[in-house]
Curated annotation (Swiss-Prot):
The keyword Lyase applies. This is Cyclic pyranopterin monophosphate synthase. Substrate binds at residues 77-79, 114-115. The keyword Lyase applies. Its EC number is 4.6.1.17. It is an enzyme of class 4 (lyase). Homohexamer; trimer of dimers. It comes from Listeria welshimeri serovar 6b (strain ATCC 35897 / DSM 20650 / CCUG 15529 / CIP 8149 / NCTC 11857 / SLCC 5334 / V8). The lineage of its organism: Bacteria, Bacillati, Bacillota, Bacilli, Bacillales. The gene is moaC. It comes from the Bacteria. The active site is at 129. It catalyses: (8S)-3',8-cyclo-7,8-dihydroguanosine 5'-triphosphate = cyclic pyranopterin phosphate + diphosphate.
Amino acid sequence: MEKDDLTHFNDEKRAKMVDVTSKSETKRRAIARATIHMNEETLARIHAGKIAKGDVLAVAQVAGIMAAKKTSELIPMCHPIMTTKADISFEDDGNTALTITSEVVTVGKTGVEMEALTAVTIAALTIYDMCKAMDKGMRIEKTYLVEKTGGKSGTFKAEA
């Protein structure tokens, strides 16, 4: 099998979950990021705690952490893993953009890239849901894997 061959298909060319039985357990870590753009007033109201549905960042943080833990229930070929760390942080540009960063860690046989990506995606969707009454034009953009470490493929860092 060549390095780029798809591993999620069986001999009948049907979907399967990859067998990781013989892989070694190693520490694996992934960082992902997403940005949600909104009106200036929306971001100001989030920071002032003046969104009718509640504390937007606290709810989005919990939603992102929950999403990391439930990724295998959402993405069919993801292995259920024991998440040993899931964290969500927020940074704004002081104007109209809020950047969400997740860090997910495990010790296991498969990586946590999908968990980190799912975490930032769900956190961004939660922000959209909580603020859509005042800003339906919000845009979720640039969701990507920033870095991953551990496992056979080693370290990956996105280009700046």
